[in-house]
């Protein structure tokens, strides 16, 4: 890929703007509307919060000055927020965001449900879970002690992530100085970036943005080593998706030197993949394959952010470029409207990051037409999951659908940033794209092809022995 600067214009972060005084609302008296069930993984996740901690979704909306999930969705979709959304200053923003995590990790009590003699206080070790009294904390300690250390990292990362949103944290970039085949995991990637990486991190640690970030939080700034580790984890979280796509290309030996460029589809894309996405976020994919003639990455899903919605071009790409675009639709509908009509080229690879079809009948129903389409058209497909348990469950679904599994296992480019299960804080944190599965076509069809290749041709001509 041709070298170019990563210092581009950054999109505005969510508003931190003056707003009218709004009196505190009793969340128990006014219950903001929750979304209707559907194929949106964002909506399903939001609904699930209420089953784990009754009243938590309403608490989140209330602290963000919102009346419904639709208003919340409008913000994470990149749309224009309602007038009531906003914060007087950065300090208030962090305070209100932290308020959305305030519930007793043991008895699940929310602030409005506490008696006057109780108050929620956080664990002093991790600063990430809350308890309404010492008895709940003691009762919860056997479970919490197993994850307290990791949750401390989560709490730091949650603050540091704001530097990505504001654009103050610019990831090191540029053509790889090492041979691509030498970069097999994060250790080799970090070694390759070497001095460039350390220079970037040290400059940010000493920056005014870092100072103001922790000053607005009103709590002590962690040691430099802690912040350094957090920045590296955040970096892997951003780069995990493009490098995991590269893993799929390597595994399937896809030709990236195809005239006109290669087409990659990210299906089931949500705000996780598309919110505040920037044009250079997938440049690392191009550097992974310096011989590429261009990558066209199209994100398809009902939760694709408005920032990414744009028409995808079928025109040939400039060699070494990565073009990002998005379509808000279910993939099988997108296929009928764009691929079958010839508007867009067939994909060289389809990827689904955490599709979750194993988790609920509703998601499986939404995913089934897409999975069958990918199988029947023999489209090279990569999916990722959070855990070994999800890997096994997803493999079982794919085996039941008679897909031909090519490879699966631990992802060498998994995110190193631990993710807290929002409404179950003592559940073991997970890591994005920790495991992967690659499949193509139908398993029984592959067996049939193999048998045909092994059987002798009944109509082959056998030459007579001249002797």
UniProtKB/Swiss-Prot annotation:
Zinc finger residue extent: MYND-type: 104-148
Listed Pro residues bias regions: 14-23
Record: residues binding Zn(2+) 2: 123, 126, 144, 148
Region annotation (Disordered) ranges: 1-34
Compositionally biased residues, Basic residues: 1-13
Domain of life: Eukaryota
Pfam families: MSS51_C, zf-MYND
Keyword Zinc-finger among UniProt keywords: yes
Binding site for Zn(2+) 1: 104, 107, 132, 136
GO molecular function, one term: zinc ion binding
InterPro entries: Mito_gene_expr_regulator (IPR052839), Mss51-like_C (IPR046824), Znf_MYND (IPR002893)
Keyword set, alphabetical order: Metal-binding, Zinc, Zinc-finger
Keyword Membrane: no
UniProt protein name: Putative protein MSS51 homolog, mitochondrial
Species of the source: Rattus norvegicus
Encoding gene per record: Mss51
